[in-house]
């Protein structure tokens, strides 16, 4: 027994004393950090899908880190203090114990691997929005490198080529760590200007004044859709989520208007859009969140070479999705016109009817494009023929298939259109929304607007306008000012017109057309204006969108 233990100890000692020990531990740390993404890649997913879970976690971590700057600064000081002390001890020949060396080497590998994933996510999703996470990576990398090898020094002639290589790598690691740390120092020491806080009253504040209840209604997908569904959404029972406002007793109105919201590609869960839904419904409207299948695999779709022109595309995948949305809208019409109506709705609305003639319709990304097609579908039912607000956020290219082309020649006088793009959207082209605006030529210019949300990296946290601004996962100060303020005003305008409340309608209207009330984004803590929204009624005449035409 003792001999076996002795042999095991001998093997461990030989491993920790071998030249391969540092590289093996660094590789182990990197493997642990990459394990989830590697597993997803092995399962046949794309690189984008492989890093997506970590992208979502990164958002969560970063929002938490923003609230803990003092703790981060304290941790960084203590960690670096210990590592600098260990560095001096190393320089005097007193090296760290092997288990502690293994921890620091593994940490170096994990940090380097995590940083590589962060770079990919930053290019694809984050666009420089987050400072503290790379700063922490830099602190961990700097401290670990100092603790393991001591202060950096240049290679000298007394070293062999392996030693020179290790010394050079150590110097490069220190430089990389310093480069990661430097941008975050103003935030850590508290000298970077902070953005405006979310409004505490009025548009953009907490959703209100009404509480909400959500009821789910499944709908049947057409057979030609179910036969080509992919596996990523096979566990979903596609449904309409109806969110109902709790109005006071005897509100003195006939009914409440309707909103229809569509989600982005590969993101049917309502959990990503509850903030958007709450801001709409809390103003006094019923919101129908429609799930539709995005993982559909029509024949020839895998190697289809799409033609994308004038904000449209001819992907064959559009057809089964349009059939699904059409089925959902027919089911929605059944729900709101049923006699008697479902008890779950009557329990909340009592005698109030749902009035789709006063309509808000919109969506995010692919859902934004499909909301334009859905508007064409519901016009035949008289929906949106008295009040209409269209809001697409970072819309994708819409279907070009003839059977789904909308015709907006008979929109009501009370129509407002917001087609919104963000500066650092790396997912869809801004030209889509610019070209979609041509669909609404019959609406007067000040009612049909292309809105451009700029990024402002002046202070900390940075305000970076990405593709994901409307999703719960990216709900930050920029979203409060650039997005949720507009959503509140949009809902207020539709609800006010449904009630004949012209005073409220006029106030909301002033927040929705090309005025300072729409474009104002508040001020940084040092008094500098946050970059305002940019409004275009004729984007073809602007330099920013000239390449789209």
What is each PLM-predicted segment?
Residues 132-175:
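Cytosolic-side transmembrane helix boundary signature
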Residues 362-371:
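Gly/Ala-rich beta-loop-alpha elbow adjacent to hydrolase catalytic centers
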Residues 305-352, 373:
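Alpha/beta-hydrolase active-site loop
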Residues 253-264, 278:
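Short beta-strand element of the alpha/beta-hydrolase
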Residues 271-289:
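Short amphipathic alpha-helix adjacent to the substrate-entry channel of hydrolases
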Residues 384-458:
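The feature captures the conserved acid-bearing segment of alpha/beta-hydrolase catalytic domains
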Residues 445-549:
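C-terminal catalytic histidine-bearing segment of alpha/beta-hydrolase fold enzymes
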Residues 173, 183-254:
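N-terminal cap/lid segment of alpha/beta-hydrolase-fold proteins
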């Amino acid at each position: 027994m003792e001999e076996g233990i002795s042999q095991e100890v001998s093997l461990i000692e030989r491993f920790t004393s071998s030249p391969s020990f540092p590289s093996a531990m660094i590789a182990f740390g990197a493997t642990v950090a990459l394990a989830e993404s590697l597993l997803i890649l092995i399962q046949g997913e794309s690189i984008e899908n492989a890093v997506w879970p970590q992208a979502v976690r990164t958002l969560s971590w970063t929002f938490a880190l923003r609230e803990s700057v003092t703790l981060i600064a304290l941790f960084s000081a203590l960690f670096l203090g210990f590592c600098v002390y260990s560095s001096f001890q190393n320089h005097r020949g007193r090296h760290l114990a092997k288990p502690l060396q293994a921890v620091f080497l593994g940490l170096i590998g994990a940090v380097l691997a995590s940083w590589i994933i962060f770079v990919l996510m930053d290019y694809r999703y984050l666009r420089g929005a987050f400072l503290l996470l790379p700063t922490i990576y830099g602190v961990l990398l700097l401290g670990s490198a100092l603790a393991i090898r001591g202060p950096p020094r240049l290679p000298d002639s007394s070293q062999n080529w392996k030693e020179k290589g290790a010394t050079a790598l150590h110097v490069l690691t220190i430089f990389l760590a310093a480069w990661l740390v430097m941008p975050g120092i103003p935030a850590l020491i508290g000298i970077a200007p902070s953005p405006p806080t979310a409004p505490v009253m009025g548009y953009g504040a907490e959703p209100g004044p009404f509480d909400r209840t959500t009821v789910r209604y499944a709908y049947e997908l057409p057979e030609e859709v179910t036969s080509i569904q992919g596996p990523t959404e096979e566990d979903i029972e596609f449904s309409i989520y109806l969110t109902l406002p709790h109005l006071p007793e005897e509100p003195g109105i006939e009914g409440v208007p309707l909103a229809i919201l569509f989600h982005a590609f590969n993101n049917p869960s309502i959990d990503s859009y509850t903030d958007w839904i709450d801001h709409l419904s809390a103003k006094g409207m019923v919101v129908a969140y429609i799930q539709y299948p995005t993982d559909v695999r029509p024949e020839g779709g895998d190697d289809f070479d799409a033609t994308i022109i004038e904000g449209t595309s001819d992907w064959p995948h559009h057809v089964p999705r349009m059939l699904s949305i059409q089925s959902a809208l027919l089911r929605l019409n059944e729900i709101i016109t049923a006699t008697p109506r479902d008890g779950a709705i009557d329990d909340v609305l009592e005698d109030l009817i749902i009035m789709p003639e006063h309509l808000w319709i919109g969506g995010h990304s692919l859902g934004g494009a499909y909301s334009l097609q859905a508007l064409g579908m519901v016009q035949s039912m008289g929906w949106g023929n008295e009040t209409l607000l269209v809001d697409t956020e970072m819309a994708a290219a819409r279907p070009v298939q003839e059977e789904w082309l909308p015709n907006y020649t008979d929109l009501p006088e009370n129509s407002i259109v917001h087609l919104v793009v963000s500066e650092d959207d790396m997912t869809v082209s801004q030209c889509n929304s610019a070209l979609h605006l041509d669909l609404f030529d019959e609406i007067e210019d000040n009612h049909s607007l292309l809105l451009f949300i700029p990024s402002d990296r002046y202070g900390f946290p940075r305000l970076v306008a990405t593709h994901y601004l409307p999703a719960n996962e990216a709900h930050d100060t920029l979203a409060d000012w650039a997005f949720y303020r507009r959503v509140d005003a949009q809902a207020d305008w539709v609800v006010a017109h449904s009630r004949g409340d012209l005073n409220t309608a006029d106030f909301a209207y002033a927040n929705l057309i090309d005025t300072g009330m729409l474009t104002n984004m508040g001020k940084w803590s040092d008094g500098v204006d946050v970059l305002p929204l940019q409004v275009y009624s004729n984007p073809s005449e602007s330099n920013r969108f000239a390449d789209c035409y």
